[in-house]
């Protein structure tokens, strides 16, 4: 059987931002562990991190699993050299140009598929053109879906029934019809449609709108989720999609590192703190005594909001780890005077990239203040850690509803309005401090921890042999082997 698997060659095309690329690379590792040949299509500045991460479990003498590097179209898109990931952009205008660059990868992808002749292509949902290009060579294209079944079900219900049109105010709640649970939202919380009429904005519009179509036109969709987490919504999604639905749930993919400490610390960019120092700090703390605060790779709060967060962390008198984007350059504009001296020993500030899975998995972590990105949400669930939910953009308000209303393992901080990565709701330190205390002390959090612990157990069971996600990955590989025999020849 292993010999047959080696004959199957799977190509991967990750979208170039950590929230999308990291889980896809976890998926690559899962395929490698099953003996499948893999090739990752990427660009020069992204290649070193990919190579480092995948080589953690690879035999360095083997060339079965490779990286195909194509030049990044910086000049053509109007980007400066060195910007090859969305989280490296520094303005909305630069972000839009980055999406132009993503669209300009169509011809290089065509060349890649023609040269490497993989048996299938797994491409991020943000590359709708991948389906047509792969089809030219008789290659089935799979979508790697970067959200869960619950947020996808919410989007489908909103698009089908348009309940948001029944309210007169952006702040009036409405019930999302047809879902298994009573889910209420406001217009202010809805994911914004990316619309553009000309120029740079058109590329973003095409990619985002095409992402929805890709779910219908691709060979199938791979979800980073597991059945036991959201069974009602797996069923809702597949029933709504009907015959068009070929779905595999193979998550949580981050658990590919569950037996590799170096894998937990090596995901994404090089961490801004050593694994040793991070664990040494955490090992000195009691179980469930530390709050972890991180808002993902794209969130940019105002100086005023950062100051409120700092004040809340100091006043709540709990141990904390706070991940800040970037260095100390502008901290004098908002960091309370003497803050670091006053919280020394109590607070650990990580400036830059943090080994999030390593941190969340530590028994000292008692709560996670999160933007509710799907990866962070799933990683917290996999670690059995309750959350303080602070959604900002994308589908994060939908993920918050899953955490707080369905799974009941989170406390809302009070974010109410969708925005472009900056946080439209300005929250005072009193509100933040209240949520921090709710997630760390009292009877309510004890019940949350019990539920979170049960979800962690379910997550681990799902990826072990015989579990739902393990079995779905086996089914996916078997389907690839079966389809390989009938693929068109070059």
UniProtKB/Swiss-Prot annotation:
Enzyme nomenclature, EC number: 2.4.1.-
Enzyme class: transferase
Protein's recorded name: UDP-glucosyl transferase 73M2
Tissue: Mainly expressed in flowers, flower buds and young leaves, and, to a lesser extent, in old leaves, stems and roots.
Gene: UGT73M2
Pathway(s) annotated for this protein in UniProt: Secondary metabolite biosynthesis; terpenoid biosynthesis
MF-aspect GO terms: UDP-glucosyltransferase activity; UDP-glycosyltransferase activity
Catalytic residues (UniProt): 20, 124
